[in-house]
Swiss-Prot record:
The lineage of its organism: Bacteria, Pseudomonadati, Pseudomonadota, Alphaproteobacteria, Rhodobacterales. Belongs to the bacterial ribosomal protein bL27 family. Keywords: Ribonucleoprotein, Ribosomal protein. InterPro entries: Ribosomal_bL27 (IPR001684). GO terms for biological process: translation. One of its GO terms (cellular component) is cytosolic large ribosomal subunit. Residues 1-21 are annotated as: Disordered. This is Large ribosomal subunit protein bL27.
Length: 89
């Protein structure tokens, strides 16, 4: 009887967990300072008024307001936060 013994170990069979990237707050949504708007690798989106960019390219709000996405130079997509007018006064 032919038997196969002591086969080599496989080098496959592992995977890394997803990094949970993407847009977290969409156009028109209200944000407060510190809210993460986009998690990304590289600069798929660029910061404009009312937002900042972290060292891992995360775009976050720096002011209260509503998120807007718009195209700019070199066909880049910019994200800004436009302050909402205080209607309470």
């Amino acid at each position: 009887m032919a038997h196969k013994k002591a086969g080599g170990s496989s080098r496959n069979g592992r995977d890394s967990a997803g990094r949970r990237l993407g847009v977290k707050k969409y156009g028109g949504e209200a944000v407060i300072p510190g809210n993460i708007i986009v998690r990304q690798r590289g600069t798929k989106f660029w910061p404009a008024a009312g937002v900042g960019m972290g060292k891992d390219h995360t775009i976050f709000a720096t002011v209260d307001g509503a998120v807007t996405f718009h195209k700019g130079l070199k066909n880049r997509t910019f994200i800004s936060v436009l302050p909402v007018a205080e209607a309470a006064e």
